Amino acid sequence: EALAHIEWEKPMVDTLRHRLVSKWNESEDEAFKHVIRFDVQKTEELFHGNWSDESKEEYELSNHTDVIYYGLDGIIKNRKVDLIIGGPPCQAYSLAGRAQDPYSMKRDYRNYLFESFVKIVEHYQPELFVFENVPGLLSACPGDTPVRYRIYDAFKSIGYDILSPNELKNAVYCSVNFGTPQIRNRVIIFGVRKGSEFKLKDFYEALNNRKSDKVFTVKDALGSMPKFRPLDKPIKVGRGNVSHELIGDVHIPLHIARYHSPRDVKVFEEWISKNMNHATTEERLNYYTKITGIKSNHIKYRALEWDKPSPTVVSHLYKDG
């Protein structure tokens, strides 16, 4: 039984509430109460309610009145919390984010948002917690002390065992090994309360035992989807342009083709015909500059390969589905 969910961004909150209603048969009122839109840095208000005027101005319309006045404690009441799952935003730790920031994200406050997660664990004292983030967390060092040491010390100070800072490199898992057709690496940190009957090593053994040698590919994921064909001429629909139409009568929600501009089509054709996926990094960066006139330190173009998992779908591609 999930007692509560906390998210900061409204689209994620809306998605969770919708799933509780449509999938788990909660009433809309219960879903509105159990999914909280709030800033976890304001832990006292999160726990106890009685929100400040500033918090009400920002979050009141997005939350149930019980949450505003009684906080998370009022939602959970006296029920025992067995498990907390979460983690801070990944932007400060991601290698891509650090490469783009003039200070390598060393001055970014999000380096320290794990402290709010620690406070939540300390407040509710679960038997276990699961903390996940990008592998860049293991090398992030916004001050004199690497983040992984800060995290270890923080959880140790509130009575929880996690892997040591040097052992955490063995806690990086790839989604491909768990039946997902996309390469996405994450650090998974299990925490066990000292004195608990649970053993830390048992959770990592269980996770490792779920690994599979079977690799799911782009073809496995998308091969049976209805196909599209290009229109003779793009058309205007609402405020956007449409360049493709679905073949056949099978319609799957959100299965739509992004508009392909003439430049897009040229890039696709050249990239595939010249096998640019296997060109050198310099060649691919130069090609991007030739097309856009913009210099980049990151490879922006890549064709998905039918017989392999997809590379990580980065967050700016959310608009493409």
PLM segments and residue spans:
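Short His-Asn-centered micro-motif
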Residues: 6-7, 132, 315-316
